[in-house]
Amino acid sequence: HIGVDKDSGLIHSVETTSANVHDITRAAQLLHGEEEVVYGDAGYQGIEKRAEMAGKSTTFRVAMRPGKRRVLPDTPDGRLLDLVETAKAHIRAKVEHPFRVIKQQFGFQKTRLRGIAKNHCKVNVLAALTNLYLARAYLLATG
């Protein structure tokens, strides 16, 4: 699970869990506390109701479930809701780009069973390298 800055596309937090842990259970650890708006896929439905999110002034914009989106009516309101979901998806795509770099540029396709601590270290190093890779143009321009 990673937290990505919406403007820069850089990874700001990493949580490594086993595959059977749901995304929403680690959402609080991905937030650094200064977020105004958080975008999530449909797996984060109901995040604002969770106890660990109580008292936060963050606005959550979570995707509609695919089944609900598929049956939106072909009316002006339905088309507007579909456009809103498309806009949310464009912003959420920023989170997927670092995964592409980790998988394609650094070849981290599958995780071997080494223990959660070793895998956590490897993912953290890959996240740092991904940030350097994504910020390379800015870093080279600044000298």
Language model features: what each stretch is:
Residues 1-57, 65, 120-131, 137-138:
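Polybasic low-complexity intrinsically disordered regions
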Residues 140-143:
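Intrinsically disordered, low-complexity and often Lys/Arg-enriched segments
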Residues 32, 36-37, 42-117, 121:
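Helix-centered, glycine/charged polyanion-binding patches within enzymatic domains
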